[in-house]
Amino acid sequence: MFGEIKNFHGERIDHTFHQGDANSKNLVLLGHGVTGNKDRPFIVTLAEALAAAGVNALRFSFAGNGASGGQFTDATISKEVADLGSVLDAYAGWNICYIGHSMGGAVGVLRASQDPRIRLLVSLSGMVRTAAFAQREFGTVKPGAGCMWDDEACPLSQAYMDDLTQIGTVLDAAPKIKVPWLLVHGKEDDVVPI
């Protein structure tokens, strides 16, 4: 709808706009999880359902994921927080609800804790304890030599592991969030347990 979106590094952020109410300035941004992208079936289905209900939606891939510019090995939570800022810049003046899944949930918490442009926040199975996640899921994988969940398209980088460890947890950001926030999390989630 608004043409190309680029992040701070000049990398293109691939995105698809789903028109809901053409007269509305309300917009739901949909952020994916680690190893995901904007074209994951449930992200597409959610965007289509929102548009059918009259709600404008934008699904996008963080840099290094899907058809966005950049390298997957450069993708970190901190970089994705900045990417989300670039998307918010492109949609200045809109009333934004951000829905983030898994790692995208952690991105939303960190961005919403510092950016009042996010007016509503939804975390779907949001990553909370990032350092624990890194060790639990990838602690036996050598960065630069191994892959996330044995997926060759998703090489594990030292930058990713260092970023998760440095963040530690997003719990410290939670008290800074001053907008309505919905947490949706299944108690049987084995990738991001409660």
For each predicted feature, which ranges?
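N-terminal cap/lid segment of alpha/beta-hydrolase-fold proteins
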Residues: 1-23
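Conserved alpha/beta-hydrolase
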Residues: 47-69
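Catalytic nucleophile-loop/oxyanion-hole region of alpha/beta-hydrolase
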Residues: 38-39, 65-91
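Short beta-strand/loop motif that positions the catalytic acidic residue
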Residues: 176-178, 183-185, 189
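The serine-hydrolase catalytic nucleophile loop
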Residues: 35-47
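Gly/Ala-rich beta-loop-alpha elbow adjacent to hydrolase catalytic centers
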Residues: 100-104, 108
